Amino acid sequence: MIDSLDLVIDTIVAREVLDSRGNPTVEAEVLLEAGAIGRAIVPSGASTGAHEAHELRDGDSRYMGKGVTKAVNHIEDRIAPALCGISSLDQASVDGTMQELDGSDNKSSLGANAILAVSMATARAAANGLGLPLYRYLGGPMASLLPVPLMNVINGGAHAANNLDFQEFMLVPHGASTFRESLRMGAEVFHTLKGLLSAQGLSTAVGDEGGFAPNLTNNDAAGDLLIQAIEKAGYSPGKDISLALDVASTEFYKDGCYAFGGGSYTSTEMVNELEKLVDRYPIISIEDGLAEDDWQGWALLTKKLGKRIQLIGDDIFVTSTKRLQQGIDQNVANSILIKVNQIGSLTETLQAIDLAGRSGYTSVISHRSGETEDTTIADLAVATRAGQIKTGSLSRSERVAKYNQLLRIEDELGTQALYAGATGQGPRGRS
């Protein structure tokens, strides 16, 4: 029998490690009284929303200013003394203590990267102390739904040095009957796409998230290539595999207009352009179709397309219950992207997912472009029954690590495992 005292936090250590772009990030280890340990590494984004929690960097000559020794020191000098002696099972108390210690609105004092590393490591330590997998510890007995992957196979925008304006062109294999099958379908299309690019003399080098980053004439050319790859791989576009976009429109929004593809568009014109894409391609999800503070544009987009497809708010919501509630009140979007480092604690992340679910919004658990071998988000997707996950392409080990963890979870669940695509709990379908 496990003694509750065994699950009390005894020691917390931190270190500076590297992410998938070669930039420093924070790793934390939480050791419990009985010896159980939890380790977590935080990710980092390239296209970050202005309203995200503050990622603390050193700003000195090391690593071109991107070192995180300040955040590491905050963990060992300030956070550890405050948390030692607290039960690892009380996640809300652990996270609340760190937020009070920080004292700012956006975690700029201690750094969201410091707080999140400890938050995630604490949950994993508690799970290990109880002898439970993380998804079961966080989600309880109902944690059995495997997510539909949104696979970013063509990278553009801030994620690639090419001429594509939109940031992500994704495959959505919702027609599979299991997660394992969905992964195979995506991999087969990925390799087929590589062959098509190579045959046209286009680059098959990959971007930050493992997708190809070719120079194409325009965004439509990317859509055409994906349809061709899906069909050549033996699948039916829209039935077996649909498409999803991350427009990341904040990146090209300036002075009230959207500048891309050689043109300049008002919010209304931008909505019309997106509607044309939905009419032309089997697109079932669009992320950040409008900029992070273009609330009126977002409302129009939702009115026009909200009943046809999933409209994900990333930069506009930044995993914040406050901003999500504002969106709910204004009928903006119908889905929220969940990035743990946008808000900076596991407790607040779970609160955002809960609010979304109670309000009829879907949640899409997401990686960042600067990732690591940490697989917490895979467990989080199953724990929360989110039904969707964005964790990159079918290459680069920091992306594949999450897919492999989901395969392990599916195997462990056995006959209890459900695939969100097969149960209708994945992305919203087309009407």
From Swiss-Prot:
The keyword Metal-binding applies. Pathway: Carbohydrate degradation; glycolysis; pyruvate from D-glyceraldehyde 3-phosphate: step 4/5. (2R)-2-phosphoglycerate binds at Q167, K339, R368, S369, K390. GO terms for cellular component: cell surface; extracellular region; phosphopyruvate hydratase complex. Binds a second Mg(2+) ion via substrate during catalysis. GO terms for biological process: glycolytic process. One of its GO terms (molecular function) is phosphopyruvate hydratase activity. It is found in: Cytoplasm; Secreted; Cell surface. Pfam families: Enolase_C, Enolase_N. Its EC number is 4.2.1.11. Keywords: Cytoplasm, Glycolysis, Lyase, Magnesium, Metal-binding, Secreted. Catalyzes the reversible conversion of 2-phosphoglycerate (2-PG) into phosphoenolpyruvate (PEP). It is essential for the degradation of carbohydrates via glycolysis. This is Enolase. It comes from Prochlorococcus marinus (strain MIT 9303). The lineage of its organism: Bacteria, Bacillati, Cyanobacteriota, Cyanophyceae, Synechococcales.
